[in-house]
């Protein structure tokens, strides 16, 4: 009927952006208004535990002929998973609060998001001017104050990086969650900004050129280029991630894979 077709397409158009808003990057719910993306990250961008119940429901429904009941069951399971994710994030926020108070970072920008492919292990990123802090918190951790591991942002490069329109657009999208560095690209000193939200410390996939050095000043680029990360994730890394998600604090620290030049206090590590 026309009513069912209307519901079908309306729910697709409404629920898809709402689900996107539950990830780290979020989505522009108010588009075409030029408002920053709305993001309440409680699930990773790719989470098999959310997707598989829906996929299995379609397969079972197609085989058994009971499409409606199978899809209803799959949807209930996936929605219950989102509710569990919201509860897990709330628990992590409560555990992180004492650590922020101890470091006098209560007013600092904080991003709490699940690590890849699960809702048991969460990553907290805290911005504090010239440095930022990373922390891993599992819902299975015992009563312990999370460790905040300090890393460099190279904030002295921030003004030059964000001077041009491309830099302004990038910070509109990322907020303060950027770090900066200089690299030689095609023989030219180039200012590069990295989005530290997605991925994992040491494995950030998105970096962009924003300015080049001409004489004694930085000149914003006309066209920004993505700079690919040479590092990949190995199975051993995922195994350590899984062990840390289970509550083994010694299995993985937030800064274990971070290159030495980003460590703000090299001798204070090992969570």
Predicted regions and their residues:
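A short glycine-/small-residue-rich loop at the edge of a beta-strand within enzyme catalytic domains
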Residues: 83, 87, 112-115, 167-168
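Active-site environment of divalent metal-dependent phosphoester hydrolases
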Residues: 19-21, 88-92, 118-119
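Extracytosolic and intramembrane catalytic regions of membrane-associated proteins
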Residues: 108, 121-123, 127-271
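Functional transmembrane or membrane-interface alpha-helices that line membrane-embedded catalytic
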Residues: 1-67, 103-106, 111-113
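Short, conserved, surface-exposed binding loops centered on an aromatic residue
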Residues: 114-116, 125-126
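Alpha-helical transmembrane signal-anchor/signal-peptide segments
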Residues: 89-108
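Internal/C-terminal transmembrane anchor helices
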Residues: 65-92
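Short, basic/low-complexity N-terminal boundary segments at the transition from targeting/disordered tails
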Residues: 12, 98-102, 161-162
């Amino acid at each position: 009927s026309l009513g069912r077709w209307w519901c079908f397409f309306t729910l697709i158009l409404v629920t898809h952006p709402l689900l996107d808003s539950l990830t780290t990057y979020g989505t522009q719910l108010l588009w075409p208004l030029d408002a920053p993306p709305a993001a309440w990250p409680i699930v990773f961008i790719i989470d098999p535990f959310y997707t598989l119940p829906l996929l299995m429901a379609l397969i079972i429904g197609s085989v058994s002929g009971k499409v409606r009941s199978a899809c209803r069951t799959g949807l209930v399971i996936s929605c219950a998973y989102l509710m569990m994710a919201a509860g897990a994030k709330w628990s992590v926020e409560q555990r992180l609060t004492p650590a922020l108070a101890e470091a006098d970072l209560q007013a600092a920008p904080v991003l709490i998001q699940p690590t890849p492919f699960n809702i048991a292990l969460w990553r907290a990123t805290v911005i504090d001017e010239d440095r930022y802090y990373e922390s891993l918190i599992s819902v299975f951790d015992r009563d312990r104050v999370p460790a905040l591991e300090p890393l460099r942002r190279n904030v002295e490069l921030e003004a030059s990086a964000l001077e041009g329109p491309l830099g302004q657009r990038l910070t509109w999208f990322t907020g303060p969650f950027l770090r900066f560095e200089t690299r030689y690209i095609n023989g030219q000193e180039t200012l590069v900004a990295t989005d530290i939200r997605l991925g994992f410390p040491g494995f950030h996939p998105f970096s962009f050129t924003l300015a080049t050095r001409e004489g004694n000043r930085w000149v914003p680029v006309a066209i920004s280029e993505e700079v690919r990360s040479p590092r990949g994730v190995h199975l051993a890394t995922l195994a350590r991630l899984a062990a840390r998600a289970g509550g083994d604090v010694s299995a993985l620290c937030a800064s274990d894979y971070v290159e030495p030049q980003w460590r703000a206090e090299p001798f204070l590590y090992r969570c």
